[in-house]
A protein has these predicted regions:
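Short, conserved micro-motifs composed of acidic
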Residues: 27-338
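Low-complexity, intrinsically disordered segments with a bias for serine/threonine
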Residues: 7, 16, 26-29
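Bacterial N-terminal signal peptides that target proteins for export
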Residues: 2-13
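Bacterial N-terminal signal peptides
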Residues: 11-23
Length: 338
């Protein structure tokens, strides 16, 4: 959720990496040094708007992401070029309704996203309700587009057992088609995380994840293709004042206890909208952090600051990136030690 406050071979490679991350030889390796997050494509993909939730094609050469302001949102498309990324354009299936939070299936055959598009043509968007208040015209549901020989299919609304809530956000797709997402707890109004098992081509009834009970806001799940781990945003301790990122692993006994990703990944303000690169080497997330400055400064430094602020560094969500492997190694080791 945003500001609420080649093919199968590559998918198989990603699954193999997931398995390798849990192997004894991997766990025994020397932990790589964790590096600080860096801004992703500043001024192009991370721009002056509220940018979040990158979804990459399996080859990593095309990215879809959400760009929004308080009353409008669209899914954007950009392609890798020699010196970075192309100027984003509105994705072919977006632009008529408020669309956000695309999530690519690991094999690239379809994409699920959030939209206020009404279920019936001709209707107006309904009202959403979460965090104890109504949001007129901001009902949301999960929709899907499928890859065709000519691009993307027309949007299809996911079935009603998925879209019962008027405020459903942040889809993420596992390799077997199972779907994770967030929706409000019916008693507290806080967002909690759900999973719907895909079985025989159909979604089963969504079930809340055992570590997410609605006591506080849990948002934006990003699940590994093999469902061995999940990264999400939460207001749980120690993130009581802002949204921070947590990781949780699944072992033989099920899901473990969520672990805070620390103050190298998490900044002083909100960090959420986690996404995983197709090769599972990079964690992407959206953050309100800004580039720190010191004083005194030269006029040249200030001019550079103002140029950067106009391009992207303005306290809105931008997309940041950090190596994923060191994080998984560190926190999986702590999970295994418990």
């Amino acid at each position: 959720m945003t500001s609420l406050i080649k093919p199968l071979a590559q998918a198989s490679a990603a699954l193999a990496l997931c398995a390798g991350l849990s192997s004894p030889s991997f766990a025994a390796a020397t932990a790589p040094v964790q590096t600080a997050p860096t801004i992703f494509s500043p001024g192009v993909i991370s721009g002056a708007g509220h940018d979040a939730a990158p979804a990459f094609t399996p080859d990593g050469d095309t990215v879809y992401f959400g760009r929004q302001a308080p009353d409008t949102a669209a899914i954007m498309e950009s392609h890798r070029i020699a010196d970075g990324w192309s100027e984003p354009r509105i994705a072919d299936f977006s632009g008529e309704w408020s669309d956000m939070e695309p999530s690519m299936a690991p094999d690239g055959s379809y994409m699920v996203y959030v939209s206020n598009r009404p279920a019936r043509a001709g209707d107006k968007p309904g009202d959403g309700f979460y965090n104890g208040k109504a949001w007129p015209g901001k009902a949301s549901a999960l929709w899907q587009v499928r890859r065709t020989g000519k691009g993307w299919s027309a949007p299809e609304r996911l079935p009603e057992q998925i879209n019962r809530s008027t405020s459903i956000y942040a889809p993420t797709v596992a390799a077997d088609g199972s779907l994770y997402f967030m929706q409000p707890n019916t008693k507290t109004g806080n967002f909690q995380l759900f999973r719907s098992q895909m079985r025989d081509g159909r979604f089963e009834e969504p079930q809340p994840l055992p570590f997410s009970g609605g006591e506080q806001n849990d948002v934006d799940p990003a699940v590994a293709p093999d469902e061995s781990f999940l990264i999400f945003g939460s207001r749980r301790e120690p993130a009581s004042k802002s949204m921070d990122l947590f990781v949780v692993f699944r072992g033989g006994a099920g899901w473990g206890t969520p672990q805070w990703l620390g103050d190298v990944v998490n900044g002083p303000n909100s960090d959420a909208e986690a996404r995983l690169s197709p090769d599972l080497k990079t964690l992407y997330f959206s953050s309100e952090r800004t580039v720190p400055v010191g004083y005194p400064r030269t006029r040249e430094q200030t001019r550079a600051d103002l140029k950067r602020i106009a391009a992207w560094d303005n306290s809105l969500y931008n997309i940041w990136q950090v190596p994923l492997r060191p994080l998984l190694e560190k926190y999986r080791g702590e999970f295994g030690a418990r």
